[in-house]
């Protein structure tokens, strides 16, 4: 889920930050509108309409978490596009796509890697919450949330059934 989220956020943020102007305004206002919707509420509503499964969970989480990545990548792109090597590439007549791929993305990549790594935790928390509520991954597949849900009835006799998945989720 974070791979798709990172790809969507990187494309939107890079295009918005590099080209600027009315396109940047339009894209970032759309991102602001999407960020104003509570993600967990939307996660529950969309998941109620779709069949619970791994593919749908990946799709839902990736479509709900790309906005923060796009804002971060846009901010870094605004910084990187003013560096000398990017200005020289633009002055030499390179195509904007080539400048983005060869100069902007490598400059933004460390930030993308750190942000994607930190966002994995929120994706795990979203998935385990859905599975705990019974809306996530179904029985044959293992999920920490479904393990916690199943361990509720045995909490007095076998507390370790809930302890280990709970610790791993935290």
Label every model-predicted segment.
Residues 1-170:
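Alpha-helical transmembrane segments of integral membrane proteins
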